[in-house]
UniProtKB/Swiss-Prot annotation:
It is found in: Cell inner membrane. It comes from Shigella dysenteriae serotype 1 (strain Sd197). It comes from the Bacteria. The keyword Hydrolase does not apply. One of its GO terms (cellular component) is cell division site. Belongs to the FtsQ/DivIB family. FtsQ subfamily. Keywords: Cell cycle, Cell division, Cell inner membrane, Cell membrane, Membrane, Transmembrane, Transmembrane helix. This is Cell division protein FtsQ. Residues 255-276 are annotated as: Disordered.
Length: 276
């Protein structure tokens, strides 16, 4: 091979080597540029997401049927946790627990976030069927809970009383005795059970029944049987039935009270009309 050909070949190899080195270097530089861009962008996005000034949870949407819960109840519950977080950082489970603990009349609450700045809260309240020991309420499942008095003052509900932890037992007795009385158009206004399981009832006409312990349904049936006779005697004497004590094997002890003035006048007018 001639010297000229050899020189030409070496020159081509040098050019090719320079090109390969240049390409490799360009590839490395490009990769480093991409990685740097990704890292910087990722850091920037993370900071942007955590920046409460960029994505604050500033809108509150409440759903669900509400009778006792006010918007401010929920707002104050959330604010008690401190400054609201961002869409990405706020833990909805913490808000849910906070509402359940601060608002005892809430049966169920679900909290979720909606992009970009909305907090949606769905509430389910307990539905009371009676008042329990004056300070609380009880629902159909025997759950007791409290509601601010000013929000329940207009509700007319039966009154139930019993030892602590006996709400289910009292509620069951109230239902059973109420169903029996309803057949004769009586309504239970109040039912109370003592720690010794002794029962006292108050009817819608304010007659008090003392049933004592045991055989409550049998004693209640005795009252229903005696009532027409007692009512007739009350009208004859111009009095009203105050209480009926049924803690006997048979019969009952009856307490009488004067008629209210308006009822007494009405009864006198009715008697005079019948005589004319």
């Amino acid at each position: 091979m001639s010297q000229a050909a050899l020189n030409t070949r070496n020159s081509e190899e040098e050019v090719s080597s320079r090109r390969n080195n240049g390409t490799r270097l360009a590839g490395i530089l490009f990769l480093l540029t991409v990685l740097t861009t990704v890292l910087v962008s990722g850091w920037g996005v993370l900071g942007w997401m955590e920046d409460a000034q960029r994505l604050p949870l500033s809108k509150l949407v409440l759903t669900g049927e509400r009778h006792y819960t006010r918007n401010d109840d929920i707002r104050q519950s959330i604010l008690a946790l401190g400054e609201p977080g961002t869409f990405m950082t706020q833990d909805v489970n913490i808000i849910q627990t906070q509402i359940e603990q601060r608002l005892p009349w809430i049966k169920q609450v679900s909290v979720r976030k909606q992009w970009p700045d909305e907090l949606k809260i769905h509430l389910v309240e307990y539905v009371p069927i009676a008042r329990w020991n004056d300070q609380h309420m009880v629902d159909a499942e025997g759950n007791t809970f409290s509601v601010p008095p000013d929000r329940t003052s207009k509700q007319v509900l039966p009154m139930l009383y019993g030892p602590e932890g006996s709400a289910n037992e009292v509620l069951q007795g109230y239902r059973e005795m109420g169903q029996m009385l309803a057949k004769d158009r009586f309504t239970l206004k109040e039912a109370a059970m003592t720690a010794r399981r002794s029962w006292q009832l108050t009817l819608n006409n304010d007659i008090k029944l003392n049933l004592g312990r045991g055989d409550t349904m049998k004693r209640l049936a005795r009252f229903v049987e005696l009532y027409p006779v007692l009512q007739q005697q009350a009208q004859t004497d111009g009095k009203r039935i105050s209480y009926v004590d049924l803690r006997y094997d048979s019969g009952a002890a009856v307490g009488w009270a004067p008629l209210p003035p308006e009822e007494s006048t009405q009864q006198q007018n009715q008697a005079q009309a019948e005589q004319q």
